[in-house]
Amino acid sequence: MKFFIFTCLLAVALAKNTMEHVSSSEESIISQETYKQEKNMAINPSKENLCSTFCKEVVRNANEEEYSIGSSSEESAEVATEEVKITVDDKHYQKALNEINQFYQKFPQYLQYLYQGPIVLNPWDQVKRNAVPITPTLNREQLSTSEENSKKTVDMESTEVFTKKTKLTEEEKNRLNFLKKISQRYQKFALPQYLKTVYQHQKAMKPWIQPKTKVIPYVRYL
């Protein structure tokens, strides 16, 4: 009985060894075959592998071209937007320059207005300028006719004054003498002239403050 068990164990052990040897030999054979196939593929590639690699390269190049086209279109769009922004900024800048030019064109008028203002408020600071009359050019005939006409008018006025003087009565002479005396008295009394000059000075300094006064005539009865 013991011998039978011992023989069975030996048979099992031998069988395991043979199985392991066979499996290891099969694995080595498979690995050698795969290595040979890979080497053959590397040396002599097949048509299918060539097509697959070529197609992959074509697809990759197409994708790169599409990406480059898309990036270029985006860049062109950005450049267009920047140009539009620049043109809008230029328009605003030109408007500002036009407004500044208009202001400087109107500025001399403003200075002229300011210069005229103090002249109105301070009339005594005005510079006395000699007015040069513009003499028109006349012919000799026109000058002779104008001289004759002036002489005739002077003669007529002198004759009219002489006739008026001859027609004056004694009452009118007395009135004239009385008026002359009154005028001489007012000329000696200088206070009204001073008041008149002061009022004119205030009126020139403050032309907007002009009180409305009612003039009451003063009549002196004799």
From Swiss-Prot:
Q: Which UniProt keywords apply?
A: Antibiotic, Antimicrobial, Milk protein, Phosphoprotein, Repeat, Secreted, Signal
Name the GO terms of the biological process aspect.
defense response to bacterium; response to 11-deoxycorticosterone; response to dehydroepiandrosterone; response to estradiol; response to growth hormone; response to progesterone
One GO MF annotation is: protein homodimerization activity
Compartment(s) where it occurs, according to its Swiss-Prot or TrEMBL record: Secreted
An example Gene Ontology CC term for this record: Golgi lumen
Predominant location: secreted
Where are the annotated sequence repeats, by residue?
Answer: 76-140, 158-222
**Region forming the signal peptide:** 1-15
InterPro entries, A to Z: Alpha-s2_casein, Casein, Casein_CS
Highest taxon in the source lineage:
Eukaryota
Entry-annotated residues carrying Phosphoserine: 23-25, 28, 46, 71-73, 76, 144, 146, 150, 158
The family assignment reads: Belongs to the alpha-casein family.
Q: What does this protein do?
A: Important role in the capacity of milk to transport calcium phosphate. Casocidin-I inhibits the growth of E.coli and S.carnosus.
| Protein name in UniProt | Alpha-S2-casein
- Taxonomic placement: Eukaryota, Metazoa, Chordata, Craniata, Vertebrata
